[in-house]
């Protein structure tokens, strides 16, 4: 495969992840499958829904969820710094999500929906340690942010041999938890495979074979091999929430559908729960296989920072560390 094809797939992964997140956010966190099905039943194009169904918060259509926003912060850091620097990344993260920002607003599950963006509790706890300079400032919980936010890092360092180390550093800033790190590393290695090699029906098993035979691996394999189960049922089985392994298992099940980019994202959003995080992952995996042409231009234009993401992604591929 030519270097230009690899670069196009890396760019597609970045854009595909963030656009999928924005497209999904209006239906994020709907955990009642009957309600979601009723609302979307007659909508052949549920993306960027003008009817905001998200029960936790209200925000502008076309913006990113907390998962996409972390993804964007990492993307911007990599471009501005011309690569990853842990201290500078921690500073950028704190400035974006910390005191005085739109994310620094009172929120309570007793008073929903919140007006404005949502900040996950483990991020709030991690911010205090980030300020102190603790490089493993994250909370010891297994959450889907770990894989949903790292696509730009994979795109820049695909094929470099440095990916595992960088993923470990990035994830532990907010999630100092082994399952979070290992899940992110597997997500990254599978995405790296698609970026470097394109579509490969055996890609999952090839990447999985390089991981130790432990419970993490068994969880991923179980989800992938239950391909006869539709994604709605898989998400119901593995859980609607943001915790791991369930959220990641729901994303893996969607990958087995072998659908195109648009169909994959729509399948994800129709399955409910913490769908924005799953869309970040599925959007990256599928876009990396099909290339940048698979992402609809009108989806990019409906993403409020879509043009900015395109420009940042173009800069990333010029700096790929292969």
Swiss-Prot record:
GO terms for molecular function: structural constituent of eye lens. Gene3D superfamilies: ADP-ribosylation/Crystallin J1 (1.10.4080.10). Keywords: Eye lens protein. It comes from Tripedalia cystophora (Jellyfish). Expressed in the rhopalia. Present in both the large and small eyes. This is Crystallin J1B. Pfam families: ADP_ribosyl_GH. Transmembrane segments: none annotated. InterPro entries: ADP-ribosylglycohydrolase, Ribosyl_crysJ1, Ribosyl_crysJ1_sf. Belongs to the ADP-ribosylglycohydrolase family. J1 crystallin subfamily.
